[in-house]
């Protein structure tokens, strides 16, 4: 995924599209993640997504659902923004 992407549009299971603002991209243990928040919505929580490749080699975003993986991304995110 390009580091200069500011927004992405994701489609849920029901076909509803939502635009998200990309807060940051993180490289952790040979995996790439993006942290996003819904654009134009009052939300306090960010969403962590892992960048994977599908069978065709195209990038796809996968929600981080495992607690251990989520905690690792959250820790890296907090460390990054505590340094600013």
UniProtKB/Swiss-Prot annotation:
Q: Where are the transmembrane segments?
A: none
Q: Say which family it is in.
A: Belongs to the UPF0473 family.
Name of one Pfam family that matches: DUF1292
Entry coiled-coil feature ranges? none
Q: Which domain of life is it from?
A: Bacteria
Q: What is the lineage of its organism?
A: Bacteria, Bacillati, Bacillota, Clostridia, Eubacteriales
Q: What is this protein called?
A: UPF0473 protein CLJ_B2791
InterPro entries tied to this protein: UPF0473 (IPR009711)
